[in-house]
A protein has these predicted regions:
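Short, local alpha-helical segments
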Residues: 83-85, 112-117
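Catalytic alpha-helical scaffold of carbohydrate-active enzymes acting on polysaccharides/glycoconjugates
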Residues: 1-27, 32-72, 93-113, 120-166
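Positively charged, amphipathic and often flexible ligand-engagement surfaces
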Residues: 73-91
Length: 166
């Protein structure tokens, strides 16, 4: 898509979000982690608080083709349900323990779990409820992404600029 097409898509999506929810969207997430320089430029133009378009270990400011962008990227750190579902090594009864193990193995990190309303909210609702319950029992703290972004941006100079790779 051209820059103009990406811009038109985001403007339309943000207008619909505003119509439905009554307030402006302050973030975006590219489907399938398909982010590029055009989407990053449009995010910067929209002055988004943050985006969550990638996989990674820690928040950063993306750089693509040598150009740095200003919208904070908070990457997903955990696999999505659909990435585990149907794989023989992850039958449903092992998924919750797998997530807990990933979080415990790197407990110092703030983990980001990307969910899909059509999976975790519908088809796998029971499994998602089990995960939430187990996280509660284990003392996992849930925080809002916008609060996390604001906390990070309070010390903007400490956030690294990193190349965004596919």
């Amino acid at each position: 898509m051209s820059l103009a097409e990406v811009r038109a898509e985001l403007v339309a999506a943000r207008a619909e979000f505003l119509r439905i929810f009554g307030f402006e969207a302050r973030t975006a997430g590219a489907p399938g982690w398909q982010s590029n320089a055009q989407s990053r430029e449009v995010y910067d133009e929209a002055n988004l608080l943050y985006a969550s378009d990638t996989r990674g270990g820690a928040p950063f400011f993306p750089r693509i083709g040598g150009k740095p962008f200003n919208t904070l990227e908070i990457p997903s750190t955990l696999p999505t349900f659909d990435e585990l579902m149907g794989r023989p090594e992850y039958p449903d009864h092992t998924i919750v323990a797998h997530y807990l193990g990933l979080m415990k193995a790197d407990a110092a990190r703030t983990h980001v779990f990307t969910l899909h309303a059509e999976i975790e909210g519908m088809g796998r609702r029971t499994l998602f409820q089990e995960l939430l319950g187990a996280c509660s029992v284990e003392g996992v703290e849930f925080i809002r992404m916008d609060d996390y972004a604001r906390e990070l941006l309070a010390n903007r100079a400490a956030i690294p600029v990193r190349d965004q790779v596919r």
